[in-house]
Amino acid sequence: MKTSVDAATLKEWIKAGRKIRIVDIRAPEQHGASRIPGSENAYISAAIKQGDADAVNRIVGEAGVPIVTVCNQGGSCRLAADLLRERGVEAYSLEGGMQAWLESQAGP
């Protein structure tokens, strides 16, 4: 099972109107400075890094709606997606995080 998506795939999913939740787990000020259209902010990355696996319970949503987690460079969101999958949620992390997303938007 695929556990992550790259920026190009996420962009295609958004364009196609695929029903997904994009959850940015970075701090609110980071989400405010740069964000993926349609994403929501749930600052849990620090809690996850400190070993609070239950922090992901705050972002579990509607059953059957996949979640794509986003962080700065891909590490924290990968862990968040792993923890969500342990709870039975279809979850993916954004490969390379927001950095990869921003680079994909810059074009050639």
Cite the ranges covered by each PLM segment:
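Short, surface-exposed ligand- or partner-binding patches at beta-edge/loop junctions that are enriched
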Residues: T69-C71
